[in-house]
């Protein structure tokens, strides 16, 4: 059975994925699916570094501006949306290109991971949420570390949703969600995929992150968060727990100064980038690329297309 073709372009935040993805899509006749857990939200543009319409250069994008910030977004919903998008792209006669830095989301697509949604338990989850709200993020993160240290390494201590989900899974199944996900990763992929990861030197990456945050502030990040807050959104909304939004909310609530908020955004983004790199290094069948080893994006895309063509010779399905 012939597998569907899929190109993945991943990498840490600020590694240059957006511009490379556009050039690659134009070269190979691709359409882009965003694998970003924040860019799905309408009205959250500055803080997510969302691609602008003119920057798309006519390349169709999926999973951008598809939900209101009041709506929850999870990995199961993401999987369903991606499958639908891939089918539509195939009907259009194009190649799907999955682009983003959320490694767990990308992995869920590549290996069609089953998250056992039928084992959700509302009572247990509610109790864990109440415990989280009462005891705080650090307490619950330490609790997770004692239960499942592997999951704790890959989940930020402030990621309430994933911490609760990992603990809930253990309480229901008496098994570790990290082991379940690892077993799912060993499945054969339903896709004939090529997996590229942009991996610039850390010092350059961190400089780019700092510059990006400064640009966000200049482009109106504070105003964007203020508008969202005035619309009734708060830290209780999943959409407002993203980096950039939660820190500015703290500033608007008078908990920290603006300079402190900006510094926190930079620091938290650098930490996120480090976790993203660690995640991708655990993946298999990955082609790592230092984008700064190439004269320009055209040369970089030449290299990517060459790699795709080389694989084609070994796998006639990718034609």
What are these regions (language model features)?
Residues 1-319:
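Phosphate/pyrophosphate-binding catalytic cores of soluble transferases and nucleic-acid-acting enzymes
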